[in-house]
Regions:
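Glycine-rich phosphate/pyrophosphate-handling loop used in enzymes and phosphotransfer proteins
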Residues: 1-302
């Protein structure tokens, strides 16, 4: 029997409706006993109240670094610009400041003293050296209090309902230029095996599946982890070293895409610290034949 036939054979409308009704009843009883409260301010009603939504330090894409997504990086953030200088693509006197008074112009060129185009600079920043695998990164908000609580409550206190809240946020930050119908798919950074055993769920896979439904993009489970230590508490250089060989490509995850490797992937993770995790995973995806990989994270360190 084909996969499609097997799925059809398992459909039982009456049982499905009964199960749905029981779930609704269960949810109603739980809500009476344990009312939903905002995870940030504890006000009853929703997981994230409107007042707290307005207080979240969202990163304005118009003022963020166009390459790594750093908040207020404006035209090119210091980190990315330093990377370009180190690779001799921009002269030291062409460094852009955080105010954007030198460096890339809004029209797409560099400062009057430079000759490189924005496209060339972007290629250097995100496609050469250690960052070659990522084409661009976007983050929703800065990982600061009280917003970091959204992620820690979701991951460590197993509030799975927050997966939908995070998926909604991510959906609003997907760059439309990344999406080409039939060519773009979603992939989530998989949880470490130890974390999966401790939590009982893969937190970014849960978010990725919900994001897939919101954006009508296929979700591909094509990455799996190779044993490594926890990244938390490690320095930037230690993170880079720790991530080497930490992911492997799983071709069986392409079954939902009829075995076809997508041209573009939006790679989803929770927090961007140094970028080591995203870069390691993106490298594996590109080695598998994916042409472009865009990073999308819920938060990033300021």
């Amino acid at each position: 029997m084909s996969l499609k036939g097997a799925l059809v054979a398992r459909e039982h409308p009456v049982l499905d409706r009964l199960a749905s009704g029981l779930n609704v009843a269960k949810g109603g009883v739980e809500e009476l006993l344990w009312p939903t409260r905002c995870v940030l301010c504890d006000v009853p009603g929703t997981l994230l109240c409107e007042d707290c939504r307005l207080e979240i330090p969202y990163i304005d894409a118009l003022h963020a670094c166009p390459y790594c997504g750093q908040a207020y990086g404006k035209l090119v953030c210091i980190d990315c610009n330093s990377f370009m200088v180190a690779h001799r693509q921009l002269a030291p006197d062409q460094r852009s400041s955080m105010h954007g008074d030198q460096g890339l112009s809004r029209e797409g060129g560099v400062s009057p003293r430079g000759s490189e185009s924005a496209t060339e600079a972007q290629g250097v920043c995100m496609t050469d050296g250690p960052q070659r695998a990522l084409d661009k990164v976007v983050s929703v908000f800065s990982f600061v209090d009280p917003c970091r609580k959204l992620i820690t409550v979701y991951k460590d206190k197993k509030e799975l309902r927050l997966a939908e809240v995070l998926a909604e946020m991510l959906a609003n930050y997907i760059d439309p230029s990344w999406v080409v119908p039939g060519e773009t798919a979603l992939v989530a950074i998989p949880a470490r095996k130890q974390a999966l055993r401790e939590r009982g769920f893969d937190h970014m896979k849960e978010v990725g599946v919900r994001l897939s439904k919101r954006c009508s993009l296929p979700f591909l489970d094509v990455l799996h982890t190779v044993d490594r230590s926890d990244q938390r508490g490690l320095s930037a250089s230690s993170r880079q070293q720790n991530m080497k060989g930490s992911f492997a490509f799983n071709p069986q995850g392409l079954l939902r895409a009829a075995g076809v490797i997508p041209e573009r992937v939006i790679l989803v993770d929770d927090v961007l610290t140094t970028g080591a995790t995203l870069m390691a995973a993106a490298s594996v995806l590109k080695e598998a034949g994916i042409e472009q990989v865009f990073g999308l994270t819920v938060a990033r360190l300021p």
